[in-house]
Amino acid sequence: MVMTDPIADMLTRIRNANMVRHEKLEIPASKLKREIAEILKREGFIRDVEFIEDNKQGIIRVFLKYGQNNERVITGLKRISKPGLRVYAKSNEVPRVLNGLGIAILSTSQGVLTDKEARAKQAGGEVLAYVW
């Protein structure tokens, strides 16, 4: 079966594993998914990311992060730009998520960036997802 939206699949896998408090999960790899996972790690939403080569497309292993009392670090994940309705933002219209408590992930001409990085570099692009 052909997957029409691999980014939504990745976010759903993370959301589902987070809801049942799994320690780790595996996602089929792609370059864009790898960059999104690196952003989530850099911003402190996940604990670690491993990239496993398997002579096919590879696997991304994501280690989820929880607080002291096993509370979730990721409260929500939302796919914004979908295959049926693409959402773009100009450099001066980059969205803020929960007044800066969350992040927006954008695909720009300068690579995959968070909303803060896109504002600093004055780059617009496709709004992939919100994470808070």
From Swiss-Prot:
Which Gene Ontology cellular component annotation is one that this UniProt entry carries? Answer: ribosome
Keywords per UniProt = Ribonucleoprotein, Ribosomal protein, RNA-binding, rRNA-binding
- Is this entry keyworded NAD? no
Q: What PROSITE patterns does this protein map onto?
A: RIBOSOMAL_S8
Mind telling me which Gene3D superfamilies this protein's record contains?
Answer: 3.30.1370.30, 3.30.1490.10
An example Gene Ontology molecular-function term: structural constituent of ribosome
Q: Which Pfam families would you find in this protein's record?
A: Ribosomal_S8
A biological process from GO: translation
Q: Which InterPro entries match?
A: Ribosomal_uS8 (IPR000630), Ribosomal_uS8_CS (IPR047863), Ribosomal_uS8_sf (IPR035987)
Lineage: superkingdom: Bacteria
Q: How does it assemble?
A: Part of the 30S ribosomal subunit. Contacts proteins S5 and S12.
**What protein family is recorded?**
Belongs to the universal ribosomal protein uS8 family.
Q: Which HAMAP family match?
A: Ribosomal_uS8_B
Q: What does this protein do?
A: One of the primary rRNA binding proteins, it binds directly to 16S rRNA central domain where it helps coordinate assembly of the platform of the 30S subunit.
Record NCBIfam families: PRK00136.1
PANTHER family assigned to the protein according to its UniProt record, in alphabetical order: 40S RIBOSOMAL PROTEIN S15A (PTHR11758)
Q: Mind telling me what this protein is named?
A: Small ribosomal subunit protein uS8
Supply the source organism for this entry: Bacillus licheniformis (strain ATCC 14580 / DSM 13 / JCM 2505 / CCUG 7422 / NBRC 12200 / NCIMB 9375 / NCTC 10341 / NRRL NRS-1264 / Gibson 46)
